[in-house]
């Protein structure tokens, strides 16, 4: 799956979209875009230039304000499954099994699963 396809799948279909660049020692830089295509292009360019690039999971009503009272839409539900020593699941395999059972038991649609790699 490419970046544009991913972003179109997880982001709402209206509002302004935000990219945030956070590099060590620098103030975060945010940029607003009217389309997911422009957001994806900017993120890819910023990444190619060696930046740490993030995107906001919500869209916003107006440019310039990435705050809760300016949120237009949020299109995703996030569930954090902690795995590892001292966490609810001993490893990712057990955490994934519990997640899949939860999805089956609740009737939620098939998810997109992302492993952050740090439990």
Predicted regions, residues:
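Catalytic residues for metal-mediated phosphoryl-transfer on nucleic acids/nucleotides
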Residues: 79, 108-109
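Short, solvent-exposed loop/edge-beta patches enriched in aromatic
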Residues: 49, 105-106
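DNA replication initiation on ssDNA origins
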Residues: 1-76, 86-89
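Short cationic amphipathic helices and targeting signals
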Residues: 77-79, 119
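Short, conserved phosphate-binding/catalytic loop or strand-edge motifs used
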Residues: 113-119
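Short secondary-structure junctions
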Residues: 18, 109-112
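A short, contiguous, amphipathic alpha-helix enriched in charged residues
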Residues: 85-103
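Short beta-strand-to-loop capping motifs
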Residues: 81-83
